Amino acid sequence: MAEGWLVPSIISHSVVAVAAGTVCADGTMPVRFWLLSIICAVLPDADVLGFRFGINYGDFFGHRGFFHSLFFAVLVGVLAAGMFFRSPTTRPWRWWLVALYFSLLTASHGILDAFTSGGLGIALLSPFDATRYFFPWTPIRVSPLGIRAFMSPWGMQVIMNELLWIWLPAVSAAVLVKASLVLAKMGSPEEH
């Protein structure tokens, strides 16, 4: 069961959510946008609760199984947008963009996990294909869950590794994209 607890940390999945939200936010977004961004990015790891109910790591609903799939990500994205961002005044294309945003955030979890160096792989194509995948390059060290284990030397090494391979790229990409958007807006003829 211990290997089932090896994932990029919940903190790093949250950093990706905040970085993505910073780029995609249209002006000042409501608190629910930021909370849902983080929830969508970490939700797939709720599958670890299955261990308490006898669901094994490699099972369909086991850790890194269906709940880490792209199909599940789309379901979550559409449900999040439908439950929290649908109103009579919302334009359909804007609603679909919000659904896509939350779907991509949820999918980012399984994709990041596929870059880790441990476990059984990620069932990215579930429920259509039960194969569990890793990417050929796995620079992200697996992370312990639980405060005690996370505060160990191993946990500190994982944080340093995630700073390099997740936080730095996510924050850098957000800053570069946001700066590019601001510069493009400043240079557009309608602003002069």
PLM-predicted stretches and their roles:
Residues 1-192:
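N-terminal membrane-targeting hydrophobic helices
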